[in-house]
């Protein structure tokens, strides 16, 4: 999911140009206001960069995300009213390279809001700084989130929110969400239009429901690659059979599922909590959220995203203090609970925030996805990550697309997914 590079798309101003424009505008505004204001203190500027998936880098997406960031910025401005916060959007695929280029010019951002995987890569390349007093910052997180964000006992980035993988559906058509994948198939047979993605990060939840995750994880060890994998075969067979049903359709990306549900071309999809705000804007009260269907004996392998804040390396001492204040305002329990209740599109990273399961079906679904589905696979997660790095997530997605399109057989798909060649460890 969720689940998520620092530079403008073609046609957007360069970072240097943006800074010059803002500096000029700030100077002029200060001069204009100096005669009618008793407080002539010039505002400090804090640059917050964030990334958007390449295929979702549109004006509407940027406006929607900017609106969400604005909620977080308001928390910060309560205690830092004389600060100007400037946000800049970049494509995911460009983040690493452009932060590198900007940092070489001492023009890097003060804060980067991105996914945990991106932030770890930035930290490894010394493009973001560890948090000072890391042990104090880390106290607000669970052991799982500390493990994701800590490198050599230093907090590489500050987790902000968990973005659980859930199901989104039209409650006018789906009266009762399916609790198992067997019920999901029955739902499709009744005429409900179901959408699934062949992206491995979006479809591996079904491998969990079938019980295939342990076998997939075992493939990183070469001695298991030539053994029979009955659960993997069962999972691939389930996907192939699902593709044969009239009302179950497969798409390459999660964004396509969201578009189709919003346009009333689908009734039930797998989604991420980050999609909730957009879908709610377009579907209104017809949108409902539930956990993904489990199997009879095993849980869905719900793949979450984790969003966090990284500290840029080019901040002045004043900007660094402001950046730390911004992150603190957005990761403390009060701020996190406030935004959670307003948006319902994430789970707070701060472990001190209680989730109101009784009053919000959406937050309950997010909470159950993370705590009862995702965390039930703690032992398997490292192996699944390694499998997709070794095999290549793109190659896995291509195989699953070929399978669900009818271009290859179940046996061919199983062979393709289980044959890691010499890349598996001995």
Model-inferred region functions:
Residues 281-347:
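Extracytoplasmic/periplasmic substrate-recognition and gating elements
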Residues 114-166, 176-179, 288-290:
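Hinge/lid segment of periplasmic solute-binding proteins
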Residues 89-98, 249-259:
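Short helix-initiation/N-cap motifs at beta->coil->alpha
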Residues 65, 365-425:
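C-terminal capping/gating helix-and-loop segments adjacent to ligand/active sites or protein-protein/ligand interfaces
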Residues 221-253:
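Glycine-centered hinge/linker elements that transmit conformational signals in sensory
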Residues 2-4, 23-118, 420-426:
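Conserved N-terminal structural module of periplasmic/extracytoplasmic solute-binding proteins
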Residues 156-160, 165, 182-233, 266:
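Extracytoplasmic/periplasmic solute-binding protein
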């Amino acid at each position: 999911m969720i689940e998520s590079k620092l530079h403008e798309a073609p046609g957007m101003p360069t970072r240097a140009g943006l800074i010059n424009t803002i500096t000029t505008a700030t100077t002029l505004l200060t001069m204009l206001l100096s005669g009618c204001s008793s407080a002539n203190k010039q505002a400090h500027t804090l640059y917050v960069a964030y990334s958007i998936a390449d295929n979702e880098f549109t004006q509407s997406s940027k406006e929607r995300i900017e609106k969400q960031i604005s909620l977080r910025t308001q928390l910060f401005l309560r205690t830092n009213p004389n600060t100007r916060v400037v946000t800049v959007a970049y494509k995911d695929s460009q983040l690493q390279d452009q932060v590198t280029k900007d940092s070489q010019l001492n023009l890097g951002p003060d804060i980067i809001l991105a996914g945990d995987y991106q932030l770890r890569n930035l930290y490894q390349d010394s493009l973001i700084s560890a948090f000072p007093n890391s042990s104090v910052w880390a106290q607000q997180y669970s052991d799982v989130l500390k493990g994701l964000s800590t490198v050599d006992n230093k907090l590489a980035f500050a987790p902000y929110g968990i973005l659980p993988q859930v199901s989104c559906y039209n409650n006018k058509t789906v009266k009762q969400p399916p609790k198992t994948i067997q019920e999901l198939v029955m739902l499709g047979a009744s005429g409900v239009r179901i959408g699934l993605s062949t992206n491995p990060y979006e479809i591996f939840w079904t491998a969990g429901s079938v019980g295939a995750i342990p076998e997939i994880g075992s493939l990183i060890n070469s001695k298991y690659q030539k053994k029979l994998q009955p659960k993997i075969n069962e999972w691939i067979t389930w996907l192939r059979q699902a593709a044969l049903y009239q009302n179950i359709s497969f798409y390459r990306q999660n964004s396509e599922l969201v578009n189709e549900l919003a346009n009333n071309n689908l009734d039930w999809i797998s989604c991420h909590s980050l999609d909730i705000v957009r879908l709610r804007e377009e579907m209104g009260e017809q949108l409902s959220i539930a956990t993904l269907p489990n199997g009879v004996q095993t849980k869905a392998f719900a793949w979450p995203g984790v969003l966090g804040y990284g500290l840029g390396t080019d901040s002045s001492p004043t900007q660094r203090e402001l950046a730390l204040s911004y992150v603190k305002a957005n990761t403390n329990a009060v701020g996190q609970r406030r935004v959670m209740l307003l948006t319902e599109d994430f789970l707070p990273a701060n472990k001190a925030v209680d989730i109101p399961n009784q009053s919000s079906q959406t937050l309950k679904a997010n909470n159950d996805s993370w705590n009862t589905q995702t965390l039930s696979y703690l032992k398997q997660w490292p192996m699944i990550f390694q499998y997709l790095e070794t095999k290549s997530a793109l190659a896995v997605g291509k195989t699953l697309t070929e399978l669900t399109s009818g271009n290859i057989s179940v046996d061919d798909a199983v062979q393709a997914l289980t044959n890691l060649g010499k890349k598996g460890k001995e």
